[in-house]
């Protein structure tokens, strides 16, 4: 996607389109219109058409989009045939939930190992995923693991991120409230659940539907 120079906002919507198109294909549907896509993914039709236009002619006016063609296109664009191996750091309540879930709907994304400092958890398996001591982080992280999920206490998030920066990890999904400072070679996505909830409550009160 980087080579095609598409806007980041468009890139963020591609997995959303792909998931819906997967469901359409499984249901046996052969074609879909931008209006149908819009209703399903809650993105306006004009935005969908503009997003798709960055990749050339994906559909035909008056016909819509061929579902199997879109499925094949997005699978290749999103590298769905390549396995993304992930490490999780912090096996608290949220981390444990991730280990049990382990992206079961995304066959190309797998948490392969987890790290914690709790003696009760180190040396065990949760959801079939081995849990190692945090002291083993650099030793255990192989060159195959390029993404880390951070679910540690905010007070230690930066120090863990600093250690990850010394490995082959290039992407961090940060679920802590801490705003991390790392080199530009590492991409961080921050997801603060408390902030998301506060934002939702604000919109419910001030922008009623």
Curated annotation (Swiss-Prot):
Residues 16-55 bind DNA. GO terms for cellular component: cytoplasm. GO terms for biological process: negative regulation of DNA-templated transcription; response to redox state. Keywords: Cytoplasm, DNA-binding, NAD, Repressor, Transcription, Transcription regulation. SUPFAM superfamilies: NAD(P)-binding Rossmann-fold domains, Winged helix' DNA-binding domain. It holds the Pfam family Put_DNA-bind_N. GO terms for molecular function: DNA binding; DNA-binding transcription factor activity. It is found in: Cytoplasm. It comes from the Bacteria. InterPro entries: CoA-bd (IPR003781), NAD(P)-bd_dom_sf (IPR036291), Rex_DNA-bd_C_dom (IPR009718), Tscrpt_rep_Rex (IPR022876), WH-like_DNA-bd_sf (IPR036388), WH_DNA-bd_sf (IPR036390). Disulfide bonds: none annotated. NAD(+) binds at residues 90-95. Homodimer. Modulates transcription in response to changes in cellular NADH/NAD(+) redox state. Belongs to the transcriptional regulatory Rex family. This is Redox-sensing transcriptional repressor Rex. It comes from Bacillus thuringiensis (strain Al Hakam).
């Amino acid at each position: 996607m980087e080579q095609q120079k598409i806007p980041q906002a468009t890139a963020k919507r591609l997995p959303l389109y792909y998931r819906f198109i997967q469901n359409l294909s499984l249901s046996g549907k052969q074609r879909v219109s931008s209006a149908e896509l819009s209703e399903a993914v809650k993105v306006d039709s004009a935005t969908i058409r503009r997003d798709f236009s960055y990749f050339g002619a994906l559909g035909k006016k008056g016909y819509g989009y061929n579902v199997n063609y879109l499925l094949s296109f997005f699978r290749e664009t999103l590298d769905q045939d390549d396995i993304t191996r992930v490490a999780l750091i912090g096996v608290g309540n949220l981390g444990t939930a991730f280990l049990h879930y382990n992206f079961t709907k995304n066959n190309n994304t797998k948490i392969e190992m987890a790290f914690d400092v709790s003696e009760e958890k180190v040396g065990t398996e949760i959801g079939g995923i081995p849990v190692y001591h945090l002291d083993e982080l650099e030793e255990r992280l192989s060159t195959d693991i390029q993404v880390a999920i951070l679910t540690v206490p905010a007070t230690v998030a930066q120090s863990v991120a600093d250690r990850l920066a010394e490995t082959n990890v290039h992407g961090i999904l940060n679920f802590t409230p801490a705003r991390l400072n790392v080199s530009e070679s590492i991409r961080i996505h921050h997801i603060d659940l408390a902030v998301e909830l506060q934002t939702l409550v604000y919109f419910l009160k001030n922008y009623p539907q």
